[in-house]
């Protein structure tokens, strides 16, 4: 046993001596030249591949949002020093060669590169810049590869979101921020960069836009050059999907410009608008603006609340057509019967009209906006059925759009109604709605009684242009008969033809609409604030078969403009005119538009020469172009 122990000790000693000798030969003699440029790092480094965030396009394919990636490039001074010795040139000469290779291929100059390389001799690795774009990086890498230059390393630095039209649809599109996901087991990295949506569409569709990380294994030689090596693994990144919106950027611009103009003219605190196709639920424009938006950085505006889905207002008299809808759908009123209007007392409260109208038919109750008349009709409907009708129209709940920040509005449960709630709700008091809710409800009046699910994204594509998801029009429910909806729409047409909105009547298209003026509720919902109003208008065109439903409102317009007929309705008309006279508009026939063109010169200010020519050609104007483009 003792001799076996001695043998083991002897064998172990011999092996130790051989291993030590082998290590000495490798480090001192270096027969395989591991110290030269053929030496590589056999332990692969895992490089994270950052996906590009998806883009956003309008309904016409115009780019609204895109991303630019930036990379950081560094120079390994030790690798450059080895290379300089091998080439028998000074270190300064080597730095000059590298500086020239970088400077001529990106925005930073050769002089700036050289300054950074020579600024601090104690640094082994020097950061040159972290603002190199992808195309610039490709040129720099090609230059280094072509001339076998040493020391260059690069890594992803950041991504910038580009909103190509700045303020346009800013609140709707939303914003992003850079975040780190922390430690990732697969890539074994601790700081995984990504842009994450924080509001608007950027937040709502973040999982589609964000993409998926990838990684690849890389090895380097002694001069920190990437080397080909067999059996390296990788998982390619997956770029984010692209959103193709229902929003028409041209219509969106028309709406926003009209609202900004209205804010100035009417002295309002905020304004909002929604335009929908009532037959599909497509949202053609969604805009919310405040007076100071244009003075702010667009990035600040993008994080502000999306007014059409978050701002609540009492709908006022624009609720009257929907109360009438509830009555007509149950055959509780006859078109030719009369209701005594003027003054009416309910539970000690006085309901009155702005004028002593006497007896009015249902159509005149809507066209003249009689509070008394609609309150009496609401009594026929009853609390239960009016409540159920308004719930079915979508009030007190979100629309199904699922847009970040959307409010469900305020609509009391039936159990909480008192003896006066039926009457106040009938003319739009005691409840609060969003512009989107209101537009969705009136789409049912426009399309024969169907509540359409509103949507903003038409389809989604991958980075190869393949459609991965498409939104199809969806009927959520039938809320009334077609006959009831058509009758209410004819009553709304009477509002424009001979009622409270005759000043927006057009010769070239029929308009159905309803004005509304609502006092602003005090904080906590108890009582109203003196002199504070919301001006509202709901309109649809053409009246006989609407292709467009629009809701406009102003928050606290100045006295005199607080009536819906004096601010919201004129804004509706301005927007309508500008949309109908846009090239390729199919809402009204070309020959009908020519009728109006003889009366009104289109606004061409700020238009590109080609766009201006297209508009003038469509009008049939003769014109002469002078000066440069």
Residue ranges, per PLM feature:
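A generic secondary-structure micro-motif detector
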Residues: 4, 47, 312-313, 364, ...
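Periplasmic/cell-envelope proteins involved in peptidoglycan metabolism and beta-lactam response
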Residues: 1-296, 384-394, 504-507, 524, ...
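Beta-lactam-recognizing serine transpeptidase/beta-lactamase-like catalytic domain environment
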Residues: 65, 220-234, 238, 247, ...
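Substrate-binding beta-hairpin/strand module that engages nucleic acids
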Residues: 344-348, 586-593
């Amino acid at each position: 046993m003792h001799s076996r122990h001695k043998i083991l000790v002897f064998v172990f000693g011999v092996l130790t001596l051989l291993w030590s000798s082998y290590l000495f030969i490798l480090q001192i003699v270096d027969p395989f030249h591991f110290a030269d440029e053929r030496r590589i790092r056999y332990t692969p480094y895992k490089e994270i591949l950052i996906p590009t965030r998806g883009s956003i396009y309008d309904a016409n394919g115009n780019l609204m949002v895109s991303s630019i990636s930036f990379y950081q490039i560094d120079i390994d001074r030790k690798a450059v020093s080895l290379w300089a010795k091998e080439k028998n040139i000074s270190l300064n000469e080597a730095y000059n060669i590298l500086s020239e290779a970088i400077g001529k291929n990106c925005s930073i100059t050769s002089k700036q590169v050289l300054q950074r390389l020579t600024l601090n001799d104690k640094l082994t690795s020097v950061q040159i810049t972290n603002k190199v774009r992808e195309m610039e990086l490709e040129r720099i890498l090609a230059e280094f590869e072509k001339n076998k230059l040493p020391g260059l390393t690069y890594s992803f630095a950041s991504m910038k979101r580009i909103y190509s039209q700045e303020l346009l649809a800013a609140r709707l599109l939303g914003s992003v921020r850079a975040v780190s996901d922390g430690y990732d087991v697969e890539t074994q990295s601790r700081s995984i960069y990504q842009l994450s949506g924080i509001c608007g569409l950027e937040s709502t569709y973040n999982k589609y836009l964000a993409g998926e990380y990838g990684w690849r294994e890389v090895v380097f030689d002694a001069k920190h050059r990437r080397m080909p090596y067999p059996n390296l693994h990788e998982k390619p990144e997956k770029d984010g999907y692209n959103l193709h919106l229902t929003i028409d950027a041209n219509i969106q611009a028309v709406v926003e410009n009209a609202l900004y103009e209205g804010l100035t003219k009417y002295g309002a605190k905020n304004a909002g608008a929604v335009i929908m196709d009532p037959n599909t639920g497509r949202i053609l424009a969604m805009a919310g603006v405040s007076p100071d938006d244009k003075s702010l950085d667009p990035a600040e505006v993008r994080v502000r609340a999306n007014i059409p889905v978050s701002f609540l207002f009492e709908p006022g008299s624009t609720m009257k057509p929907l109360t009438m809808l509830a009555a007509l759908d149950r055959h509780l009123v006859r078109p030719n019967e009369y209701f005594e209007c003027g003054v009416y007392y309910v539970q000690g409260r006085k309901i009155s009209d702005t004028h002593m109208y006497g007896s009015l038919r249902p159509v005149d109750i809507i066209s003249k906006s009689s509070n008394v008349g609609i309150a009496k009709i609401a009594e026929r409907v009853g609390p239960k059925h009016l409540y159920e009708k308004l719930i079915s129209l979508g009030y007190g709940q979100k629309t199904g759009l699922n847009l970040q920040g959307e409010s469900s509005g305020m609509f009391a449960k039936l159990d909480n109604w008192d003896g006066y709630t039926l009457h106040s709700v009938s003319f739009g008091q005691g409840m609060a709605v969003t512009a989107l809710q209101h537009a969705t409800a009136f789409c049912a009046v426009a399309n024969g009684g169907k509540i359409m699910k509103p949507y903003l994204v038409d389809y989604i594509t991958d980075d190869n242009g393949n459609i991965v998801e498409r939104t199809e029009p969806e009927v959520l429910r039938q809320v009334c008969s077609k006959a009831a909806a058509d009758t209410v729409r004819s009553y709304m047409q009477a509002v424009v033809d001979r009622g409270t909105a005759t000043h927006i009547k057009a010769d070239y298209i029929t308009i159905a609409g309803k004005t509304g003026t609502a006092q602003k509720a005090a904080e906590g919902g108890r009582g109203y604030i003196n002199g504070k109003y919301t001006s509202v208008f709901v309109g649809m065109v053409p009246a006989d078969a609407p292709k467009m439903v629009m809701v406009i409102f102003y928050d606290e317009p100045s006295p005199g403009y607080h009536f819906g007929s004096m601010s919201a309705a004129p804004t509706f008309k301005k927007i309508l005119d500008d949309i109908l006279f846009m090239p390729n508009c199919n809402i009204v026939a070309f020959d009908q538009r020519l009728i109006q063109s003889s009366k009104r010169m289109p606004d061409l200010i700020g238009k590109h020469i080609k766009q201006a020519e297209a508009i003038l050609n469509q009008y049939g104007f003769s014109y002469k172009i002078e000066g440069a483009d």
